[in-house]
């Protein structure tokens, strides 16, 4: 029996309402708007208050369901990509399943950091092609404000909270053209968080900030920024070139590239090395900062909402993250 094809039915997103500007950060750490924008391209980021990761994921899921015109009962599988789950167990996916009442679906989490959503797209596609599922909800969601050291200007300026989602469905036409995934554990220590508490919420941040230094050890994100920058540029180019080659397409055939929104300077370097206009990349890092697994689906949902993609257009999703991991996918909009 011939395997089924897969396409994206709908997308959704949710951003918490609290926006923290660079100017706001300058009141609590030694930084300023120009310093942050010059190095990262970030102007502001969203932060949760009183919301868990599952709450953000639930709202993005409901948005995608509404736009797709389907009920939660029609979902066969829910995949949540996150490094900031509500708990060690149960999975955030199961909590979201309960919240949206998608009781016919099975659900699980994956942890691939900023590459997680594209990993989820790959997994969902395989379940559909193999006939195990017909409709799959893939969510990328993070509440990174739990893991940010608000005294460290090198990291707290970068991250934000948010959630994006996509519903994949079986199709007669091929929408998910190619996926390329990779990882290299030799770089595991370049970007890490050894936090023993995954349920720190915004109300507890003040307590953490007033704690003794030894109490804070290992609770926050640690990153070798220079090495991550070099790694990111290399694997993003590698990922883009790989999915183009496997799809027998060229850069001129691509309408949009949706990159992981980690640092505007990374995207600029990739564009320069590929010899393409930066306008081919969809960029929203100035509004939201780095939302890890949520960054690509949030951007995809925005592109969808704005009507920037028409039937037959080609879009590349490409990202990188802790692990080290990287992922790219070439999608035809149908």
From Swiss-Prot:
GO terms for cellular component: cytoplasm. One of its GO terms (molecular function) is beta-ketoacyl-acyl-carrier-protein synthase III activity. Its EC number is 2.3.1.180. It is found in: Cytoplasm. Keywords: Acyltransferase, Cytoplasm, Fatty acid biosynthesis, Fatty acid metabolism, Lipid biosynthesis, Lipid metabolism, Multifunctional enzyme, Transferase. Its main location: cytoplasm. The active site is at residues 114, 260, 290. InterPro entries: ACP_syn_III_C, ACP_syn_III_N, FabH, Thiolase-like. The last Arg residue of the ACP-binding site is essential for the weak association between ACP/AcpP and FabH. Belongs to the thiolase-like superfamily. FabH family. PANTHER family: 3-OXOACYL-[ACYL-CARRIER-PROTEIN] SYNTHASE, BETA-KETOACYL-[ACYL-CARRIER-PROTEIN] SYNTHASE III, CHLOROPLASTIC. Homodimer. This is Beta-ketoacyl-[acyl-carrier-protein] synthase III. It comes from Clostridium tetani (strain Massachusetts / E88).
